[in-house]
Amino acid sequence: MNGDMMDTNVIIKYLAGDISAKRLLDSSSEISVSVIVVGELQYGAQKSTRSKSNLELFANFLSNFSIVPVDENIAKIYGEVKDQLRKKGINIPENDIWIAATAKSRQSRLLTYDAHFRSVDDLEVVS
């Protein structure tokens, strides 16, 4: 096991002061973030009415964590996960397949509030 990875919704809830998200992060000793999550946060900040302050907030928060880039191994796992979900007749957002693949590649638990991640084989999801 290689620590935990945070999904976007955990970060948003944590920054909004959500107690359950704070407990979730406090219970983990090693946390990383997929570069895909960074992109989702960037997009969310860009489209918000408080773009500049949100960009600063996210950058400051993310500076405390290791950012995991997408590499060839993650791309291969992405293909496997997407095919596995297709065979089950399950559709989840593309970015979430990438996030799941990143967590699987590192054998990390995924901290998320999205239940659809539980459809991914061999991915430990913590809410």
Label each residue range with its predicted role.
Residues 7-8, 41, 78, 103:
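Generic structural signal for small/hydrophobic residues in well-ordered secondary structure
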Residues 67-111:
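Active-site neighborhoods of divalent-metal-dependent phosphate/nucleic-acid chemistry enzymes
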Residues 15-18, 112-116:
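Short, polar loop motifs at secondary-structure junctions
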Residues 22-26, 117-122:
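Short loop/helix-cap segments at secondary-structure boundaries that form the rim of catalytic
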Residues 11, 38-41, 75, 117-118:
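A generic structural signal for short hydrophobic patches within well-formed alpha-helices
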